Structure formats: structure tokens, C-alpha cells
């Protein structure tokens, strides 16, 4: 297809027209004409006409016009996103094939059967998959929950107007509702005035479950069950939940002093309240539906003397759910003991639902059992009483400081000064000791008290409400043992997964030896229940070394971990800390999973889902269903049909690419003394720290570029369209390989090795979104004269990267093989270009005026950030 679907253009045109009506109503025809002039100027500029007219139009805007112009283009981009999302899930003619997301699992199951996999083995493997998607807050998630709900309602009206049998009056009513919703969105502030709290972020995550995933989970499982039955004649077991959810919102305290033990407790209680409330809605619906009299002896024994036994049993469950909800609500305000009626165990939720289900089937009413009751059962298996499992994350340095304070107090010396072997000896001895390490009168510092308070919250919370304890910047076996000891001292007597997160290039290279040392310790092995979980960091390794070297280090670390766990006869669970952007390990999940090393996805897969990508991937039930299908199919395929290990020649060339890539990356980022100052002048990085975008500070406590968090590092370059972290290093690595005459080998790797093909595909995607002209416009407006040559050099490197990828793929244009995607990017550019130029102007004015927070310039700047993030479909 060379042009975007005409119906998508119709929707974009309609939504734009309705937005125009709203803007005209508030600001008049002349202002709307000015917006249209800017839009047409951007379009002409893209077609090669002189861009001076567009720049002049923006330069002439008065201070009062800056904010409404920025808001107009921001809203255009959000409406275009809605139309595009709708296009992805609807409007398929019967003559067209089903979308890939709907076909992927049935086609995979058919292929597996054809290749000799037995029906029993397939059904068993699909039912046993353990996929956990970990929802994380995002310091740059810019869309307010209020607006997201209005955007979802707009998508609903697009679906309503698609019915073919509408009368003209009904069609008119839909357009009126669309007009009203767009007006509501326009007259709602798109940017929050204050930073969200960690609890606000957790509520945002719960809202995604309430409004989308609650519906999507039973829908995708119903279709997976149908696909399995068609391929094997077998059904998914009732207790099967291949995909579950965890969360970092309210548990991730790494670099965020706002996440305290009290916050973690509050979020755990809120999750219990929300879960009980959602089940109560389901039970009310089921009680109205299940009016039947005939029931199995087992159900009748539980229901007592009732003419409507199903309703009687559900009434008992409803009373317990109400008690649970009321207790959780009261416990948010004060410590309240839980009464006997409060539900604490998932079995108590599941058992009455399963009893109803089995009874209906036994009494010949399977068609009723397999309706909303089955949906409720599958939600209960997936979400349980706690909705999501909350992870706790903290930096290893905080644990080292706490241990140092403790050993210092006890007169044992300073833990932080000890060798690794001395630390391990001490920690293993204390872990096996029956006496407490800490005396009751120990008075820790505020930081250590907070670490211990968090561990006590873990001790007091139900095990099923918690996920893993993740240690950021882990680099040694003692990092894991120290957390185990702190948990033990705080009363955590049950096993809890303590997960090292290996982030930098050096730590990734050291991940194998660290885990090998741990797994050789008998005391450690005896405490390990279930799989050994290890987290692979994508963001910091890419910031440290560039994506070329980081991607290869991540791959090799996983290979080594697979080998070590196989040798030690321990099951491995790899946890992937991916971001939304290519520079942070993001990209299409299906391709990414299939590109993992063989053996690394053995029926288990855990990954983070980042703030703004949660909205795009799971914000609407139909979109969520598509993405759940992709995860399910990809993990099943990677488990049963893993890729072959890379050939020695590929490994050798990848070593060369990584070495050349990291050298080229660090020459720019670390060795050029002008680089940090150029970054700060040419991007909105400094301004981002002042904007109320998330609960976590954008920088760690002190330091230069190393202290900058990976997210704003990516965000700054994304806003200016240079996209530097995602490609820098590849241009040198690939060019040198071609110069050595290794082009044929690169082509073979791209053709036959999923890992390399996926890396090149993601590189091509980000290069297609990059724009040297836009990046230059920021330099011209913001950068001091002596730094301009560096900007020109970086844009030259971008051109080299584009040229070498085109040479490798044999195309004349990036994404020529994906015209739909290319057209989506072009459609957005018409609205993005004015926002970029306007943002550069706003940055210049803000820096010159030292604009205070809340000023029109600052507000317009924040809106431009939000609009560009929406237009590019990712932030950091």
C-alpha cells in the first residue's frame, strides 16, 4: 500500500474538523486560520518548499498565542493516535485477512502440530506458560488519566459510527457526541500542575486494569482456548493464567525518595480495595444471571436450603468481598485488624466460582457456565485478590550503607570497606544464625530506618501480594545476600525472590560469574525456592556503551546465565528491564522475544511495560487483547522452537561490531569535552527536570552525565528528533565491517539470525523517525556558536547511519518495505514540525526570560513536550 488507508484519513479529517470547530468557538475564525496556515506551511516545508514562511509564522506569535497554538497541535496528534489505534483493531472487510495479531497463535499451533508436537504436549505447554508483565510508572508519562479516559470515549464513538445500518439521525447523534468529547478534551488542562505522587501513579496503573485489561484478559483467553481446541481438541485448564501482571508503581524506590514504606503499604491496600470492588461488580452481574435451580450435590451442600442455590453461594462470596473492600478502605486511614470475613487467600475467591462452574456443567448447563462466569473465573485466576504483585526495587548502595551502619554500630568494622569475600563470609554466617543481628535498641539513621521499614512492610504483607525484591546496580554476590539478611532481620521468614539487576556493560559481563558464585553456595541454594530470577537492564547499559555494545552484552549475559543454571540444575527466569524506546531496549515485543538466545525463554518470561507504552499497548481492550496474543504466541514459539545458536563467524563479527560501536559512542559521549554542554543547550533536558511529569526526580543525587537517569537522557534527544542514543555507534561499526569486506556476512546474519535482524529493524525504525533538519532548527535557536560544529558533526553521523542501513537492506528509502508505517510517520510530521519549531522558540524565550513555573511560556513548553511525545508514540 503506497497511501494510508482512506478510511483512516477520513477519521483524522473528521476529528481534526471537530477540533477546529472547538478552537473556533473559543478563539474565533482568525485564530483558526492561523493554525491552518501553520499546518499548511509545515506540509509545504516537507514537500521541499522554503520553510521560512513557517518559521516566520511561529516567530510572530504573541505570548498569549503560544499556549493555544501548542495545545492545538498537541490535540491534533492525540486525535491522530486515536484514529490510528482504531484503524489497527477495526474496519476489516470480510475479504481482507485477519490481522497478524489475531492469526499469530492459531497459525503457530497449526505449524507446531504439523511439525510433530503432540496435542497433549502443546496443551500442557500453553497452559503452563508463565508470562509476567510488570507495569512501571514513567517520569515522562505526560498524558493525564482524565484525558486518557476521554480519548478512550472518542475511540468508542469512532466504533459506533462504523455500524453500517445507522440512520442519518443516529449518525448525527454520534457526531454530536464526538464534538462534545473533543470539546471536553480541549477545555481540560492536558498537563497536571503538580507532580503526581507514587500513589497517583499506582492509581493510574489500576485504572488501566479496570478500564481495559479486566475485559481483555477473558477475551484473549477465550480466543486462545478456541485456537488450542481447533488445533488439538483440548481446552485450556480453568486454572491456567499464562499472562499475569506485577507492578513497580509504589514499590520502586530506586532514586525516588517519595516512595516510602508507608507508600508501599498504601498501594498494597489500594490494590486489594480495587480488586474486591471489581469482583463485586462481576458477582452482582452473575447473581442476576445465575437464577437456575438445578445444582450438583456439592453445591447444594454449600448453598443450604435455597431455591436458588447459585445465588445463595454467590451471596456468601459477595458478603466476604464487601468485608474485604470495607476493611481495605478503613486500613488506609488507620491500622485495623482484619475480621474473619476478610479474604486473604486466592483459593477462597476461586473455590465458590469453580463450584458454580462445575455444577452447571454437571447439570447440562455448560453453555451458561462458559459465559460471564468463565470470564470471572479467568479474571480471578489472573488477578487474584491482590490485582498485581508488587515488586520492591532499591539501589544496592542503599543496602551497603545500611549494612555499614549496622556493622559499625556492632563494633565489627565498616562493611563497605570489607573485601567481597569478607562480606560473603559475614552474610552467610548471619543468614544461618538463629539469633537476631540487630539489638532492639538500635537507632538507625533516617535512610537505614527507611530500608528496614520497607523490609518490615514486606514481612507483614501477604506473600501473594508481592513479586520480587529487585536490586539496582547489582555487581556482586554480596549485593543479593545483604538483601536476604535485611529481610530476615525484619521478620521475612518465607522465601522471597531477591533479584540482581545487572545494568552497566561491566556488570552485564560480570553477571555470569556473580550468579555462578551464588549458586555454588549451599546456603544460598537451600534458600532458593522456584526459579533463579535475574534482571537484565537495557537503559543504563545503552547509556553507558551505546546500543551496539549493550545489545551484544545483554545477549551474551543471557547465554552465560542459561548455561550456568543448566549446569547447576536450577531453573532460570530472566526479567527484561526494557523501556519504550529503542535506546532503552524497546521495540515490537513479538520480534524481541523471538530474538532472545536459545534456552533463555523456557516457558517463562518477565518484562517491564513502561508508562506511556502501557497506554498505547494496553489502554483499550481490543489493543490490549492484540498485544496479549503477541506475548502468548511469542513465548510459546521461543520455548518450543528456539532459534539456533549463532554461528562462530557471526559471533566474531558481532564482537567486532560491539568493540567498534562502543569506541565510537564513547568518543562522542565521554571523550568530547563539549558534549555535555551541547546536550544541555540543544535539548530540553534541563527544562524537563522542572516539569511536573512524574514522581521520581529526573537526576540522581549528584554528578554529571553519568548521574543523569536513562529516561530523560533518551527523552531529550527524542524531543529534538536526533534520536542519538538509539543509533550512535552503529554507523561506525557497520561502516567498518563493510570496509573490511564483510557485507555478505552482515547480510547472512540479517537473513538468518533473529537477534541481528531485530536490531537492524529497530535501528531502521528509529532512523526513519529521526530528522536532521528538525535537530538543526534547535541548534540554530539555542546553541552557542562554538558548539554548532559538534551538532553538525552529529547530524553527519546520523546521515552515515541512514546510508549504511540503506546499503545493508538494499532499499532506496528507509522503511520502503513498510509503507503503512512510513505513511503513519508522514501523517504525524505535518503536526509535529510546527511543535518542534515552536518548542525551540519556547526554549529560547524560557531561557532568556528565566520563565517561572506556571508562566504561559513554561505551560506552552510542557504542552509541546506532551505533543511531541504523543506524535512519536514514545518518550523515554
Curated annotation (Swiss-Prot):
GO terms for biological process: carbon fixation; oxaloacetate metabolic process; tricarboxylic acid cycle. Its cofactor is Mg(2+). The active site is at residues 138, 543. PROSITE patterns: PEPCASE_1 (PS00781), PEPCASE_2 (PS00393). It comes from the Bacteria. GO terms for cellular component: cytosol. One of its GO terms (molecular function) is magnesium ion binding. The keyword Magnesium applies. It catalyses: oxaloacetate + phosphate = phosphoenolpyruvate + hydrogencarbonate. Keywords: Carbon dioxide fixation, Lyase, Magnesium. It is an enzyme of class 4 (lyase). The keyword Magnesium applies. Its EC number is 4.1.1.31. InterPro entries: PEP_COase (IPR021135), PEP_COase_bac/pln-type (IPR022805), PEP_COase_Lys_AS (IPR018129), PEPCASE_His_AS (IPR033129), Pyrv/PenolPyrv_kinase-like_dom (IPR015813). Belongs to the PEPCase type 1 family. Forms oxaloacetate, a four-carbon dicarboxylic acid source for the tricarboxylic acid cycle. HAMAP family: PEPcase_type1 (MF_00595). This is Phosphoenolpyruvate carboxylase. It comes from Pseudomonas fluorescens (strain ATCC BAA-477 / NRRL B-23932 / Pf-5). The lineage of its organism: Bacteria, Pseudomonadati, Pseudomonadota, Gammaproteobacteria, Pseudomonadales.
Amino acid at each position: 500500500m503506497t497511501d494510508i488507508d482512506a478510511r483512516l484519513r477520513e477519521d483524522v479529517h473528521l476529528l481534526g474538523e471537530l477540533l477546529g470547530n472547538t478552537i473556533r468557538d473559543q478563539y474565533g475564525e482568525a485564530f483558526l486560520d492561523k493554525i491552518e496556515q501553520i499546518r499548511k506551511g509545515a506540509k509545504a516545508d516537507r514537500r521541499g518548499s522554503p520553510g521560512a514562511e513557517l518559521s516566520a509564522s511561529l516567530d510572530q506569535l504573541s505570548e498569549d498565542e503560544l499556549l493555544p497554538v501548542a495545545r492545538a497541535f498537541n490535540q491534533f496528534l492525540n486525535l491522530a493516535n486515536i484514529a490510528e489505534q482504531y484503524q489497527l483493531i477495526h474496519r476489516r472487510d470480510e475479504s481482507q485477512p485477519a490481522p497478524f495479531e489475531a492469526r499469530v497463535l492459531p497459525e503457530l499451533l497449526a505449524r507446531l502440530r504439523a511439525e510433530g508436537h503432540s496435542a497433549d504436549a502443546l496443551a500442557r505447554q500453553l497452559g503452563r506458560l508463565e508470562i509476567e508483565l510488570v507495569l512501571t510508572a514513567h517520569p515522562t508519562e505526560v498524558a493525564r488519566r482524565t484525558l486518557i479516559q476521554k480519548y478512550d470515549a472518542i475511540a468508542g464513538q469512532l466504533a459506533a459510527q462504523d455500524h453500517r445500518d445507522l440512520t442519518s439521525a443516529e449518525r448525527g447523534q454520534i457526531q454530536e457526541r464526538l464534538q462534545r468529547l473533543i470539546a471536553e478534551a480541549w477545555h481540560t488542562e492536558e498537563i497536571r500542575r503538580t507532580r503526581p505522587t507514587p500513589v497517583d501513579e499506582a492509581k493510574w496503573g489500576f485504572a488501566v486494569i479496570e478500564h481495559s485489561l479486566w475485559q481483555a484478559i477473558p477475551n484473549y483467553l477465550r480466543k486462545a482456548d478456541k485456537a488450542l481446541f481447533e488445533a488439538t481438541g483440548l481446552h485450556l485448564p480453568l486454572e491456567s493464567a499464562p499472562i499475569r501482571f506485577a507492578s513497580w508503581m509504589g514499590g520502586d524506590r530506586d532514586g525516588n525518595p517519595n516512595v516510602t514504606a508507608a507508600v508501599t503499604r498504601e498501594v498494597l491496600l489500594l490494590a486489594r480495595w480495587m480488586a474486591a470492588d471489581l469482583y463485586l461488580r462481576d458477582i452482582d452481574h452473575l447473581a442476576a444471571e445465575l437464577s437456575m435451580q438445578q445444582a450438583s450435590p456439592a453445591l447444594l451442600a454449600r448453598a443450604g436450603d435455597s431455591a436458588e442455590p447459585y445465588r445463595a453461594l454467590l451471596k456468601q462470596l459477595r458478603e466476604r468481598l464487601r468485608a474485604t473492600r470495607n476493611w481495605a478502605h478503613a486500613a488506609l486511614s488507620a491500622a485495623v485488624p482484619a475480621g474473619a470475613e476478610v479474604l486473604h487467600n486466592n483459593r477462597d475467591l476461586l473455590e465458590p466460582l469453580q463450584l458454580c462452574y462445575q455444577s452447571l456443567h454437571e447439570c447440562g448447563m455448560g453453555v451458561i457456565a462458559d459465559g460471564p462466569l468463565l470470564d470471572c473465573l479467568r479474571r480471578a485466576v489472573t488477578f487474584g485478590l491482590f490485582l498485581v504483585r508488587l515488586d520492591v526495587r532499591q539501589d544496592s548502595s542503599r543496602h551497603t550503607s545500611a549494612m555499614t551502619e549496622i556493622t559499625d554500630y556492632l563494633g565489627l568494622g565498616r562493611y563497605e570497606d570489607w573485601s567481597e569475600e569478607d562480606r560473603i563470609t559475614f552474610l552467610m554466617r548471619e543468614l544461618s544464625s538463629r539469633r537476631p543481628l540487630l539489638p532492639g535498641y538500635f537507632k538507625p539513621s533516617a535512610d537505614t530506618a527507611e530500608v528496614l521499614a520497607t523490609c518490615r512492610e514486606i514481612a507483614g504483607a501477604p506473600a501473594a501480594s508481592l513479586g520480587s525484591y529487585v536490586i539496582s546496580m547489582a555487581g556482586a554476590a554480596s549485593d543479593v545476600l545483604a538483601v536476604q539478611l535485611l529481610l530476615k532481620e525484619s521478620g521475612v521468614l518465607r522465601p522471597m525472590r531477591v533479584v540482581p539487576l545487572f545494568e552497566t556493560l561491566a556488570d552485564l559481563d560480570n553477571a555470569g560469574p556473580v550468579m555462578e558464585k551464588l549458586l555454588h553456595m549451599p546456603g544460598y541454594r537451600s534458600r532458593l525456592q522456584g526459579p533463579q530470577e535475574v534482571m537484565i537492564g537495557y537503559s543504563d547499559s545503552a547509556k553507558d556503551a551505546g546500543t551496539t555494545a549493550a545489545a551484544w552484552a545483554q545477549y551474551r549475559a543471557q547465554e552465560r546465565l542459561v548455561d550456568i543454571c543448566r549446569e547447576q540444575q536450577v531453573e532460570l527466569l530472566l526479567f527484561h528491564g526494557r523501556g519504550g524506546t529503542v535506546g532503552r531496549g524497546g521495540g515490537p515485543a513479538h520480534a524481541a522475544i523471538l530474538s532472545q538466545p536459545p534456552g533463555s525463554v523456557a516457558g517463562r518470561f518477565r518484562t517491564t511495560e513502561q508508562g506511556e507504552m502501557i497506554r498505547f499497548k494496553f489502554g483499550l481492550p481490543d489493543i490490549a487483547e492484540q498485544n496479549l496474543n503477541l506475548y502468548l504466541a511469542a513465548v510459546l514459539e521461543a520455548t518450543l522452537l528456539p532459534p539456533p545458536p549463532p554461528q562462530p563467524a557471526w559471533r566474531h563479527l558481532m564482537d567486532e561490531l560491539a568493540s567498534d560501536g562502543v569506541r565510537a559512542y564513547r568518543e562522542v559521549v565521554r571523550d568530547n569535552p563539549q558534549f555535555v554542554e551541547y546536550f544541555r543547550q540543544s535539548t530540553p533536558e534541563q527544562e524537563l527536570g522542572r516539569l511536573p511529569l512524574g514522581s521520581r526526580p529526573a537526576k540522581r543525587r549528584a554528578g554529571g552525565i553519568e548521574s543523569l537517569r536513562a529516561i530523560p537522557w533518551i527523552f531529550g534527544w527524542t524531543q529534538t528528533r536526533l534520536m542519538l542514543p538509539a543509533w550512535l555507534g552503529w554507523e561506525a561499526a557497520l561502516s567498518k565491517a563493510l570496509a573490511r569486506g564483510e557485507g555478505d556476512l552482515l547480510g547472512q546474519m540479517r537473513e538468518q539470525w533473529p537477534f541481528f535482524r531485530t536490531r537492524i529493524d529497530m535501528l531502521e525504525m528509529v532512523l526513519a523517525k529521526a530528522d536532521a533538519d528538525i535537530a538543526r532548527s534547535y541548534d540554530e535557536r539555542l546553541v552557542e556558536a562554538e558548539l554548532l560544529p559538534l551538532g553538525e558533526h552529529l547530524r553527519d553521523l546520523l546521515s552515515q547511519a541512514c546510508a549504511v542501513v540503506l546499503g545493508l537492506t538494499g532499499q532506496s528509502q528507509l522503511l520502503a518495505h513498510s509503507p503503512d508505517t512510513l505513511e503513519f510517520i508522514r501523517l504525524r510530521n505535518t503536526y509535529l514540525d510546527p511543535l518542534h519549531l515552536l518548542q525551540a522558540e519556547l526554549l529560547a524565550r524560557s531561557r532568556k526570560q528565566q520563565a517561572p513555573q506556571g508562566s504561559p511560556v513554561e505551560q506552552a513548553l510542557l504542552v509541546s513536550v506532551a505533543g511531541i511525545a504523543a506524535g512519536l508514540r514514545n518518550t523515554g
